Amino acid sequence: MNTPAINLETEKQLFFHNYARLPLDIASGKGSFLYTASGERYLDMIAGVGVNAIGYGDKRLEQAITEQASKYIHVSNLFMQKPQFDLAAKLLEISRMSKVFFCNSGTEAIEAAIKLARRFAARNGDTDKTQVLSLTNCFHGRTYGALSLTAKPKYVDGFEPLVPETGMIDFNDVEDLERKVSNRTAAVFVEFVQGEGGIHKVSEAFIAKLKELAKEHDFLIVADEIQAGCGRTGAFFSYMPFDIQPDLVCVAKPLGGGLPLGAIIGSEKVAEVFTPGSHGTTFGGNPVACAAGLAMIEAILADGLMQNALEVGSMMRTAFEKMAEKHAQILEIRQYGLMIGVTVHREAKYYVEEALKRGVLVNATSNNVIRLLPPLSISKEEAQLCLDTLDAIFTEEAKA
């Protein structure tokens, strides 16, 4: 077989056109930087869209992967596997919850949570309790159940009809929450910090009312921690600063240390809902991914990366606020740990392209939001490089 050229022309020939790829042939990574095959260096402020929490080339992560891979890479979930036990125990210790189910991705975690919520109601005799709700501007995934809970029309276009008995509550609208939930509601899914939606945090008032209504109507509260979890906001899970304990927590992205891994974590209330055969997966909880996940979590805890997320994130927010005083292009700044959204006056894609030319990788979401999701291990000096780059772009844009 001839080795294909690595460029955008070949990419169009080989793949379905799912991604608007950047013209970079990535060869390696170290710390907060990626390197191309031609030797160019890029500061990665995307981190695999929030996956690479401890950066690239961490020896502890590499050792965990190679040690487990040398023993076995896969066996059926019909067998007990130490990497699964170790990671599940760590997640339950952190969350103070009751049970774990491993899958392969965030969207699979959402699907499992939808199934569990409906089965929980059915097993309690509430066969009409099938409604599953989410919030506007949310993103929960691309498989049909998760897609049905996802707000943006561009993800839904052409895929209707979606799963019935799903719907949206207006984000942070307490009155709409009261209107939408009822005794037919099985679950409400919440991103406590919306990532794809532009880095927006749910309000204390909304969560207080959600708790009250969940008790009144006996529905489950599901925290989607796929992007905001594993320390990114400065707490291990973004729901933790709120006065709430969800019934289910969905986790993925950084959970596998860069390998495919997702999970739902359940409270004692839902601990007995799944029974053998009611839900499952061939590859979920892959032992190599679980070993990597444990190493990743231990690195976050040992290296104080949640505190680093708070400190570097605060430093970046302050810098952006000063930047906004001289650059009218910046309309709003939202920052929760190292989840940062900067609303700008035009399509954010422009700034993505300009930063790329200068060796910095940033992301655009919600049309006019620059989204930054760097490794939690990023230094203040590296963050300053990103800030200086964006400052220069804003300055040059104003002169044009």
Curated annotation (Swiss-Prot):
It is an enzyme of class 2 (transferase). GO terms for cellular component: cytoplasm. One of its GO terms (molecular function) is identical protein binding. N(2)-acetyl-L-ornithine binds at residues 142, 281. PROSITE patterns: AA_TRANSFER_CLASS_3 (PS00600). Pathway: Amino-acid biosynthesis; L-arginine biosynthesis; N(2)-acetyl-L-ornithine from L-glutamate: step 4/4. Binds 1 pyridoxal phosphate per subunit. Its EC number is 2.6.1.11. Keywords: Amino-acid biosynthesis, Aminotransferase, Arginine biosynthesis, Cytoplasm, Pyridoxal phosphate, Transferase. Its main location: cytoplasm. Its cofactor is pyridoxal 5'-phosphate. Homodimer. May also have succinyldiaminopimelate aminotransferase activity, thus carrying out the corresponding step in lysine biosynthesis. NCBIfam families: argD (TIGR00707), PRK01278.1 (NF002325). Belongs to the class-III pyridoxal-phosphate-dependent aminotransferase family. ArgD subfamily. This is Acetylornithine aminotransferase. The gene is argD.
